[in-house]
Amino acid sequence: MEKNYFKKIIARDANGLQVISACCSDSKVKIEDIKFLKKNKIFLLLIERIKKEKKSEEKLKSIIKFEYIASVKSKNINQNNNSDILELLGIDLFRDKKNYNISIYFKNNAFITLSSEILEVTLEDQSEQ
């Protein structure tokens, strides 16, 4: 009997974030599944991703959780159309004087930029489809 283990990857540096980005590239995200919990300083993406670790076409529901987020900016994303689906291309990290700027890139030149003093990002698988 094969056991199913769901992954949980925690990134606290640029290398860890690259691993999460690689696992999540080509994922689908509904606009309604993007949430910023300002009071808790948490930004969430519920994604449908392909399980690249096993080189299969198996699809998973996963959550990418960004913690300690001070601000969120987006461009070329129509937030009024909740049913639109974005395709995630990758996640990148830039550092200025005291903050991390995390850029989440989607197809069609859409992106979200998160600002945080501390880098902590978690990718956690929720269920197989």
What are the language-model segments listed below?
Residues 1-129:
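Surface-exposed, interaction-prone regions used to assemble/regulate multi-protein complexes
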